[in-house]
Amino acid sequence: MKNKIFHTQDLCLRTNLRCAKNSARMEIIMSEKVSIGILAVQGAFAEHQAMLDGLGADTFLIRQKKDLEEAVQNGRLQGIVLPGGESTVQGKLLRDLGMSDQLKELIEAGTPVLATCAGLILLVERVSNDDRAYLKTLPVSVKRNAYGRQLGSFVTDAEITHVGTYRMNFIRAPYIDEILDLQVETLAIVDGNTVAVRYKNQLALSFHPEVSEDARVHAYFLNEIVQGV
């Protein structure tokens, strides 16, 4: 099957997604339609789904254990999104719904994952200001609500390695306060704090790219992590 190549500018026109004027050139290279499961127990899953659908991915929602199991059995799970929201609620629901162990196993086995804000907290090995930890697949430590609660939310422009200058939306956001493995790649720093990292198959962000009109973070996830382009 011939690869489909879309320039970011074309994608913006086709999906009403905005490209920053100073953005690095990026392409979506789809050798086939990739299938991405989006955790949908709580949080901003619909926004992630709209962004990925606009980039040509085949998305589905993971609301309960059987959704995850069926996707694995059918070979339909090529990537996972853990959205922003409330990490304590999401973590409790994952345990109550019996999905924690399987998600952890899938991620540790190499299934690509994009985690934003609360999703980042679900992944990390340690939360420096909270005793609770969840999947523990990402060797970093984070500080929850590091910028304060709702009144501490803000928007800023900063550089993301491999992506370019990007407008970041921080909403009751954590930041990464310690890297625990030399293989963790820091992708973005804001005011001296690490806010985006990659570790093998895991892309984790403090901010919310799904509420942006800029699709480049999701494009990077599809290109470089899901498809390994």
Q: Language-model features: where?
A:
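Cysteine-nucleophile active-site neighborhood
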Residues: 86-158
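Amide-donor transfer/coupling interface in amidating biosynthetic enzymes
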Residues: 144-229
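Hydrophobic anchor at the start of a short beta-strand
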Residues: 59-60, 113, 202
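A secondary-structure boundary/capping signal
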Residues: 41, 116-118, 138, 172, ...
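Flexible, glycine-rich phosphate/dinucleotide-binding loops
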Residues: 45, 68, 122, 129, ...
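Redox-cofactor binding/interface segments in oxidoreductases and associated redox assembly factors
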Residues: 82, 115, 205
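N-terminal beta1-alpha1 cap of cysteine-dependent amidohydrolase-like domains
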Residues: 1-12, 17-96, 102-106, 215-219, ...
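Solvent-exposed alpha-helices and their adjacent loops that cap or buttress functional pockets
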Residues: 30-32, 72-74, 105-106, 114, ...
